[in-house]
Structures are given as structure tokens and as C-alpha cells.
């Protein structure tokens, strides 16, 4: 999917200047060009300003307009730029823009886009114009960019901002719009329009049957700049009403035929409004997930219904954990309804009642039980930009305190049901939980089992020899291509590289394993150096699944065990995750290196389980000894990843990162946390509090979350039963700690 997107970023484009690029590209509303200071050279100052043209790929064809805005250029050659592209039907449906930093060296301005695969652009002068190149693993394109005097000429017209309902009656998404086959929504509306407005009453009708959503064209935009309509594949879903709730019968990933995207439907609401022509109204939240990555887009849907018919379905998407494609979608799709029985209906109704009964209590951020007002509660998110954050908060003594459930169209009205693509947080909430459950069932010795005894290793080297389940979970298998020195400055040199993206595209388990085993061998033994790679976690998932089948029979499935024996006892009845799709269409093994889309309610339940040592309602669900080790509550401290915090090295062990922290009484802790691509964090604090932030702005500092948690409840006082032990010892003098 990312390789496809990379191609779309530049595409195959026409001869430079062949199209009118006026109003074709999005530009930041706060964009400004600062005249170069007098202490810089004239050669550097020439780059300042706005430049535009169209791109030409090696293969020819029509493609996008491109705009470069050099906002600042400094005397040392560093520059701040905005890079923007328009649409090119049919390959590039969405204009996009990025801010980036670059540098002019030997007359060439070079910068990388802030995307995981780091595509590179260069510009150099060719007469009075700029000759540009764009390169990544999928694209090689050139352009001739001319100077544009007026920045406003190239900026696309912005869609109007959303506004919340202003009166006591509905003036958006009204019945006439919903019932008309020709309605074309003009853009996003405020999320409140998907919920009851004005005087409402209980639903006049009930739903029990099958909804069929038909194929449609959906509009979309990036940063208020409209793109081309895109096709949305239809699907069929059984639903029923339960009191004021609308409940989908299937809560796993639904993949419409021929679509690379999947959908997860969640429970919504039903009610009646006086202007709905005697019909009832429903809305529900859903999430769109990708076929190969863990990106997730949160949407809302609404429709009218009576006992026999439904209106069109109005949908919109206005938030995501998908930093490479932060776009809005909206539209209306035809829909039909067939009343009738639902398979396993009695169980589904009973299960939904239990799900609601076991919901984690939720309170607003303002209700935090802090002992005194502190700046750290306000600074909880550190340098994370609010628009980048989907949801954030803390879990205290089994209660959720939520700071925000944010979208670009207003607060998400189904905050509890909002799902988040958490990427590598899955390595803990998926892979580690699975191995800890196996250890509780079959003994802690499963951590010492060898990968090669359960997976056919096709590597041409001995790097996998004697690698244990624990080594794989700790990312200390001596396997990889890049970062060949022990002192390599980044622990994940192979992630987000061309070979990794080829591995992502593999559909079946065997294809994925075979591609993973093409990685080379490092010159050190297992268990000594962290080389973080999701390929290793997937190999562990395959080994764990094979081990479970050996113990429980060929019909056993690793993720079913996790859901049935860990998640469901906690009250998490639905936790869809990404699986391999085998050649016969059957569900394969779970990926577990990424793929989970948890809600904040799920996170509250799971972090509470971890904070309580793997015990729930008097039953030990996870191995207590191995969980304590994973949470840095024993003498085991894992391996340094050669990244420093102000108190020492970050470390990694059994899927948990840790950062050293020293309290004011000079007690030293290793704070365990989970980290996922884009800025997804779950932090387990030593006072029993857990903090979370799901975002896609690539911000990585969690210290403000730790400081806020300590402000709520000091780390050096007694925590509730089941919370971790207190400080692990006094820190040495000098204000810092060494070596983790």
C-alpha cells in the first residue's frame, strides 16, 4: 500500500508547464516567506520564494503540478520549505503538502519528505529556473520549476470550515437530503450533525435484518483542498437495535470484494427527530483499515429508517492515525434494507449487554483527582500538536480520564468506540500478551523455546540458530541487513526501507516468512544487540501459533486463544486485528508486529491487567513472573538501544521500551512503555497509573506524560493493590543516571 502511495506522490507526469497549475495545490494557511538575512550569500538567497511546474517521470504520461515554497534560507545553507503536489487523474486523486527541512550544499537544495520511507527531492538552478528531481524506491521524476511571484496564485481554494449546530432544529443532513438520490454533499459537516439535535424522542421503529450499502463515489480533500472523487466499494452488514443502540452483528474487519480497504463497524444510536417525515434516525461509528499497513481512519455514518426501508447512507471521515495520508472523506451512498432474522442473534444480544455492563467508567480530564493544580497536567502532550492527536488520557484505579477524542470536524461523538491504528503497540498488546498467556498455560519455559523448532527457517545463514521466543520478543535476534555495527545509532535500521515494504505486501504466511528470511546475519550472538524489525515479531507469531497447535490441536488459532482467554474475561469482546490472508481465502495467523486497532476502553482494561501483574478477578491470566520481568520490575533490565534521555539510556526488553526517570526524592525507575509508529504511546507508571496518546505527528517525547502522572499521584507513595513496587534505588548524584 505504501509503495502504491509512493508512486501516486509523483506518478507519471507530462511535460513541464503543460498544464495550468493555478489553484492546483494545497499550501499551509500560515505560510510565509522570510526574506534572507544580509549575512548570507546571494547564491543561497536566490532559492527564497515560490517555484512551480509539472513533473515528468521516466515513462511519461500526465501527472501533478508541483510547488516548492522556500520559506526560510539561512546563512549556513539550511532551509525550511513547503512541498506540495496537485492531482493527476486517475493515479493521483488527492493533492498533498508537507513541511520539511533541507540544506543547500554545492548549489543543490536537498530535503526529504516527513514520510516513513523518506522520499527525497533536490533542486538546483538551471538559468533562472530550478531543475528538480524526486526519488524514492518507486518513483524517479524531474521538473522545471519557474519562479511564481504571487503565492496565492497556486494555492487551492479552501473548503469552508465546519460549524457546529447553531439552533434547536436540524439544518444539515436533513431528511430531504437523505432521501434524495441526487444529493452530493459539499464537504464535511460538524460531527454533532451525526447525533441527536434539538427535541428528540426514542426511535419509532426497530431494525433487525441486513443493510446493503451499494457502490458509490466519495469526495475527499487534504487540508481543505478538494481532490478527485474516489470509488467506495459496497458491503452487506446485519444489524439489530437494542434499546437506544444500533448494533452490527459482525465486529471484525469486513473486506468488500475488490477493495484494498476494510471496515470495522461499531455500535451506534437510534432516535427520532420531528423533521424526519415519520422515520427514525440512526448513526454509528466505523473505522477504515488498510490491507497491508496499520493505518486507520475514523468515520461516522447516519441514515433514516422505518420498519421496511432505509434512506441513503451519509458518511464522513475526518481523523486518522495515518501520517502519510491525512485526508477528509465525505459522501452519500445508496442503501437498502431487508428485514429478517440474524444468525446467532440471542448470543449477540446477550454479549452486547455484557459489553455495556463491563465498560470502563469514563470521566473528562477536568475530573482528574490531582492533589493540586499543576502545569504538568496542561503540558501532558508535550510538543505534540493537538491536531495530530486522536485520543489521549490516563487510567487511574480502573477509571478512564479522557483529555480529547479529536477530529478535524469536531470532537468524535463516539469516543469510547473510536479505534486507533497503533502500529507497534501491537507488539505488546498482541505478541507479548500472547506469549505471556502461553507461559501461564504451559509454563514459563515457552520463553526459551527455539524459533527454528516451530518454523521452517529458509535463511541461508545461521542467524536464527538457537533464537528463542524471548529473543524474538526482545528484538535481539542477530538478523538484518543494515546497521552492521553494535554502536549503530538507530535500533531499527531495516524498518521502513524498500525491502521492508516488499515484505509488507506479502499476502500469505509462507510468502511473508520466506521474504523475512532473506535478511542477512549480524556478526554477534543472539541476545546481545537490539535490532528492531517487525519481521522478527511476525516470525515469532508463526512460531507461537505452531506451538499452540502442537499443544491444543490443529484447530487451535493463536489470536482466538488471546481473545477467548485474555480479552473476553476483561470485557473486550471484539478486538479485530490484521491476519494473513491465505491463498484459499482463509484467515491466516495474526501479524502481531502491528495490526491492532484498540479503543481507549480496550487500552484501559489491558493496562489495568498489566499493572495488576496479569491477574483479573482473582484469576491469573498472564505469567506473573515473566510479566514482572517485561515491566522492569526484576533485576532484568533488557538491552540499551543507544538512545539517551536526560537520566540515561532507553532500553528494550520483551516488547517493552523503558526510559529511566528520577523522582524529586531521588528514587530511580525504569518506566516501561509501548511505542507505535507516528506517535502512539502507552506508558505504565510506577504509581499504578497508565497514560496513553494516539497520534500521527511523529512526536516521540513521553516525559511530560510521566510528569503529569507523577503530579496526580507521587511515585514514592503507596499505590493500590497490584501496582508495581516503589523506587528501585537512589540515583547517584549529579542529576542523572547512567546506563539505564
Question: Predicted regions: what is each one?
Answer:
Residues 304, 369-414, 682, 690-691:
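A short, well-structured edge-of-sheet supersecondary motif
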Residues 432, 535-546, 594-616, 680-696:
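Active-site-proximal alpha-helical segments within enzyme catalytic domains
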Residues 421-446, 472, 540-544, 603-606, ...:
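Active-site SXXK
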Residues 154-298:
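Noncatalytic N-terminal accessory/assembly modules of large enzymes
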Residues 574-581, 632-694:
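Active-site Gly/Thr loop motif
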Residues 367-392, 460-572, 600-604, 609-612:
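Active-site-adjacent helix/loop patches that line small-molecule binding or acyl-intermediate pockets
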Residues 159-183, 192, 440-480, 518-523, ...:
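Active-site helix/loop module of the DD-peptidase/beta-lactamase fold
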Residues 19-153:
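Central antiparallel beta-sheet cores of small beta-barrel/beta-sandwich binding domains
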Amino acid at each position: 500500500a505504501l509503495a502504491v502511495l509512493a508512486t501516486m506522490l509523483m506518478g507519471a507526469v507530462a511535460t513541464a508547464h503543460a498544464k495550468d497549475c493555478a489553484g492546483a495545490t494545497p499550501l499551509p494557511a500560515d505560510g510565509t516567506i522570510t526574506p534572507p538575512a544580509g549575512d548570507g550569500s546571494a547564491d543561497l538567497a536566490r532559492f527564497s520564494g515560490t517555484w512551480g511546474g509539472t513533473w515528468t517521470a521516466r515513462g511519461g504520461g500526465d501527472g501533478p503540478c508541483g510547488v516548492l515554497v522556500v520559506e526560510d534560507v539561512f546563512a549556513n545553507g539550511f532551509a525550511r520549505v513547503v512541498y506540495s503536489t496537485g492531482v493527476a487523474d486517475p493515479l493521483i486523486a488527492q493533492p498533498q503538502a508537507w513541511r520539511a527541512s533541507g540544506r543547500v550544499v554545492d548549489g543543490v537544495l536537498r530535503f526529504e519528505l516527513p514520510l516513513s520511507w523518506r522520499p527525497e527531492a533536490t533542486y538546483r538552478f538551471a538559468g533562472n529556473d530550478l531543475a528538480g528531481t524526486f526519488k524514492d524506491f518507486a518513483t524517479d521524476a524531474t521538473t522545471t520549476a519557474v519562479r511564481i511571484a504571487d503565492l496565492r496564485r497556486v494555492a487551492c481554494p479552501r473548503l469552508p470550515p465546519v460549524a457546529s449546530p447553531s439552533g434547536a432544529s436540524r439544518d444539515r443532513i436533513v431528511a430531504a437530503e437523505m432521501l434524495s438520490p441526487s444529493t452530493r454533499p459539499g464537504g464535511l459537516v460538524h460531527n454533532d450533525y451525526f447525533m441527536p439535535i434539538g427535541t428528540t424522542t426514542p426511535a419509532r421503529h426497530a431494525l433487525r435484518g441486513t443493510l446493503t450499502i451499494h457502490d458509490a463515489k466519495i469526495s475527499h480533500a487534504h487540508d481543505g483542498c478538494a481532490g478527485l472523487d474516489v470509488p467506495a466499494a459496497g458491503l452487506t452488514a446485519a444489524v439489530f437495535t437494542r434499546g437506544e443502540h444500533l448494533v452490527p452483528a459482525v465486529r471484525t474487519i469486513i473486506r468488500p470484494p475488490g477493495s484494498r480497504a476494510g471496515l470495522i463497524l461499531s455500535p451506534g444510536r437510534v432516535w427520532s427527530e420531528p423533521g424526519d417525515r415519520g422515520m427514525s434516525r440512526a448513526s454509528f461509528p466505523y473505522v477504515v483499515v488498510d490491507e497491508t499497513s496499520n493505518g486507520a481512519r475514523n468515520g461516522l455514518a447516519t441514515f433514516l429508517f422505518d420498519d421496511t426501508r432505509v434512506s441513503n447512507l451519509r458518511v464522513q471521515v475526518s481523523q486518522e492515525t495515518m501520517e502519510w495520508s491525512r485526508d477528509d472523506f465525505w459522501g452519500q451512498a445508496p442503501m437498502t434494507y431487508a428485514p429478517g432474522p440474524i444468525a446467532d442473534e440471542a448470543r449477540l444480544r446477550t454479549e452486547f449487554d455484557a459489553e455495556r455492563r463491563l465498560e470502563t467508567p469514563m470521566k473528562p480530564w477536568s475530573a482528574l483527582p490531582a492533589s493540586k493544580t499543576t502545569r504538568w497536567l496542561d503540558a501532558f502532550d508535550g510538543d505534540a500538536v493537538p491536531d495530530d492527536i486522536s485520543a489521549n488520557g490516563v487510567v487511574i484505579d480502573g477509571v478512564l480520564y479522557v483529555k480529547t477524542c479529536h477530529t478535524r470536524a469536531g470532537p468524535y461523538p463516539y469516543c469510547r468506540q473510536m479505534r486507533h491504528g497503533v502500529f507497534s503497540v501491537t507488539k505488546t498488546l498482541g505478541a507479548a500478551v500472547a506469549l505471556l498467556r502461553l507461559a501461564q498455560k504451559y509454563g514459563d519455559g515457552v520463553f526459551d523455546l527455539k524459533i527454528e523448532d516451530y518454523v521452517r527457517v529458509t535463511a541461508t545463514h545461521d542467524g536464527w540458530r538457537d533464537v528463542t521466543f524471548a529473543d524474538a520478543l526482545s528484538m535481539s535476534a542477530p538478523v538484518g541487513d543494515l546497521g552492521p555495527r553494535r554502536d549503530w545509532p538507530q535500533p531499527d535500521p531495516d524498518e521502513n526501507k524498500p525491502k521492508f515494504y516488499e515484505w509488507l505486501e506479502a499476502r500469505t504466511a509462507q510468502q511473508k516468512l520466506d521474504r523475512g528470511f532473506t535478511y542477512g546475519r549480524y556478526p554477534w550472538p543472539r541476545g546481545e544487540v537490539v535490532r528492531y524489525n517487525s519481521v522478527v515479531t511476525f516470525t515469532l507469531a508463526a512460531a507461537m501459533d505452531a506451538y499452540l497447535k502442537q499443544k491444543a490441536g490443529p484447530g487451535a488459532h493463536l489470536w482466538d486463544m488471546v481473545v477467548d482467554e485474555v480479552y473476553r474475561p476483561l470485557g473486550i469482546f471484539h478486538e479485530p486485528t490484521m491476519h494473513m490472508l491465505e491463498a484459499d481465502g482463509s484467515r491466516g495467523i495474526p501479524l502481531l508486529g502491528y495490526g491492532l486497532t484498540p479503543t481507549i476502553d480496550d487500552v484501559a482494561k489491558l493496562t489495568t491487567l498489566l499493572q495488576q501483574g496479569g491477574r483479573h478477578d482473582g484469576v491469573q491470566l498472564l505469567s506473573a513472573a515473566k510479566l514482572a520481568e517485561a515491566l522492569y520490575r526484576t533485576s532484568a533490565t533488557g538491552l540499551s538501544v543507544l538512545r539517551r534521555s536526560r537520566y540515561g539510556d532507553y532500553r528494550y526488553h520483551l516488547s517493552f521500551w523503558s526510559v529511566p526517570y528520577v523522582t524529586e526524592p531521588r528514587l530511580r525507575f525504569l518506566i516501561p512503555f509501548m511505542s507505535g509508529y507516528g506517535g502512539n504511546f502507552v506508558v505504565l507508571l510506577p504509581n499504578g497509573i497508565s497514560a496513553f496518546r494516539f497520534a500521527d505527528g511523529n512526536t516521540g517525547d513521553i516525559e511530560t506524560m510521566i510528569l503529569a502522572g507523577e503530579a496526580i499521584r507521587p511515585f514514592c507513595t503507596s499505590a493500590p493493590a497490584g501496582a508495581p513496587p516503589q523506587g528501585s534505588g537512589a540515583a547517584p548524584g549529579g542529576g542523572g543516571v547512567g546506563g539505564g
